[in-house]
Amino acid sequence: MGYDNVCGERQTLLVVANRLPASAKRTGEHSWSLEMSPGGKFNLLVEKDAVSKSLAEMKCIPVFLNEVFDQYYNGYSNGILWPILHHMGLPQEYDHDTIKTFETQYDAYKKANRMFLDVIKENYKDGDIVWCQDYHLMFLPQYLKEYNNKIKVGWFLHSPFPSSEIYKTLPSRSELLRSVLAADLISFHTYDFARHFVNTCTRILGVEGTHEGVVYQGRVTRVVVLPMGIYPNRFIKTCKLPEVIQQMNELKDRFSGKKVILGVDRLDMIKGIPQKYLGFEKFLDENPNWRDKIVLVQIAVPTRNEVPEYQKLKNQVHRLVGRINGRFGSVSSLPIHHMDCSVDSNYLCALYAISDVMLVTSLRDGLNLVSHEFVACQEAKRGVLILSEFAGAGQSLGAGALLVNPWNVTEVSSAIKKALNMPYEERETRHRVNFKYVKTHSAEKWGFDFLSELNDAFDESELQIRKIPHELPQQDVIQRYSLSNNRLIILGFYGTITEPRNSLSKEMDLKLNPELKETLKALCNDPKTTVVVLSRSGKNILDKNFGEYKIWLAAENGMFLKHTTEEWVTNMPQNMNLDWVDGLKNVFKYFTDRTPRSFFEASKTSLVWNYEYADVEFGRAQARDLLQYLWAGPISNASAEVVRGKYSVEVHAIGVTKEPEIGHILGEIVHKKAMTTPIDYVFCSGYFLEKDEDIYTFFESEILSPKLSHETRSKSSSSNHSLEKKVSLNVLDLKQENYFSTAIGQARTKARYVVDSSHNVVNLLHKLAVANTTTTSVKKPNV
């Protein structure tokens, strides 16, 4: 189908779903009649050409799954994934045969997803959008990206997503998450489902969750909340049709003198029909005056009749209906009218329109659009919606509905009584709130919003995916260093020039690599070279390691700065809120005490928990728990942000990053050294977190101008005063060939170059120090 994006460009949309919106009926020996329908399994395995031809006229393309269908659909999709996603857990009968069955179903599920891919490949054209629907197609995003990583791929889950504690029981938990994360956009009906998904990815895959989504393979997979809607105008218009008005009048005559409670559900375990009947029974028990004035009409659409569990549910429901009607009914009147069938759309709208109360008691529901349909048909009646708090619609329509816990039959009974006795003014107010929502959050808007988000997410993802940089050309680094007149070397501390920690017997204190002591001293003593150590560590740690050198130290990501011959000054804003720090220290201590060989650093503006020297798997598990705890509460309203490193979890004040402080640091250095010669060479290397990698691009903008007249402003303060200085001079005269930004051990980075480990940086620094003292002429490299 076609789609016009926000720029007015026409794009082709491929909606991929387990069910086509059509039902088929044979009209001849080789012909079929197809009608658009709201759902229903469509799996014709014969006469493929005839069916495909008829479907093509409706812009539908079938995928014939043949022998894998039962294992894929009834087996893995509905037998394993569906119960997990709806908080029901895996089947309890677990033996060797069950395990083999799981494996067979899992293979069929992957094969079916491959078959969907094959059909997409036959129909896809460059620029098309592919929108994957629901849990039946969790492998499809990965398969699509493997086929062509330029395809715009979105995935929407129509069911709930469970907590990580439930999801992690799934044997194929990691593979499914990774496959879904290949999509450019992932969307859910509610914030709870999205939060569960992000937390699950964090706990199981060890990836970082952000307010935008999940950081995975060098990019952010965007996660959004877009609750689906209906086509409200269709229902409003249907209620005004003459034949529907006639049906409404017939229903009013049939139930004359009675209040009508309506239930419309699939006969399914999650729909809570038994709980609905138990709540209704309690209401009749406690309110005898209502027994001959009320009727509950329940439409229970049959589903999966071949499954034993569903047969048991049907029998249970029928027993409840018989018991309640036997207790409270009479020859002329029954309190429950139970219908084991579906009804046509006109009759359904008539029922919606004449009902006084809609009763939805889902035990777990992705959304429940029945509640939306009821609201759309209630322009005249202003009936009351009683809605389960476990239905996704509860987060959208909760303001105008009576929310209930369906497991609490007393609460359901009380809600029925309140709804029946509710004054018209309150009913009017509640209806107005929900009607406005249903009208403005239609299915059209849902689709448009999803596709707009997908286009935006894809464009952003393209920007995030960076080219793998080249290996650092060490000979060029050395030669350019020797030819320059004013050099700036910026080094990270942890993971860059710290002592390697390969042995469990070593101490965990951060120490300067002993191989660097003489090298660093030689570089720092060179009048043409300025060395800066930029670290997230606190002032005490840097003082302890670098007190004997003539070096510039920037602690806590540049919040504090000093030359080792002077006192610390601060760049920290005066109004920075640090109230959260003391409260989190106990949290970090808790995880440190329970994770052997982990440690945490507490500084004025940040807390860092490090588990590099702990057991890796246990450390990752503890880090996931710590992250989940932090995001759930302690910093939710604090002026702080959480950042996950490879072996660390850091919480720091908002705005504390390395890149913004480089300008302040440069200004301070220029002022203190009274520089008259512009900096013409920069070597910047570190094992930096992704959030700090903008430090590499800081100098890129300066390179655009061969010689930049630079006004640098820096703030300096001691404990007694703060001072703002303004320095105006040619700070930088930096050419492309004289700038070497270098990341350590990272394939995806904003740096120009990479090296495998800190050992490479140590060796290079030694060669630079030697280049200072050599008398051999240096040949200018080719550029």
From Swiss-Prot:
GO biological process: trehalose biosynthetic process
Glycosyltransferase: annotated span: 11-456
Keyword Membrane (UniProt): no
GO molecular function: alpha,alpha-trehalose-phosphate synthase (UDP-forming) activity
Keyword Transferase: yes
EC number: 2.4.1.15
Classification via InterPro entries: Glyco_trans_20, HAD-like_sf, Trehalose_PPase
Catalysed conversion reaction: D-glucose 6-phosphate + UDP-alpha-D-glucose = alpha,alpha-trehalose 6-phosphate + UDP + H(+)
Record keywords, A-Z: Glycosyltransferase, Transferase
EC primary class: transferase
Family per similarity comment: In the N-terminal section; belongs to the glycosyltransferase 20 family.
Protein name per UniProt: Probable alpha,alpha-trehalose-phosphate synthase [UDP-forming] 3
Annotated source species: Arabidopsis thaliana (Mouse-ear cress)
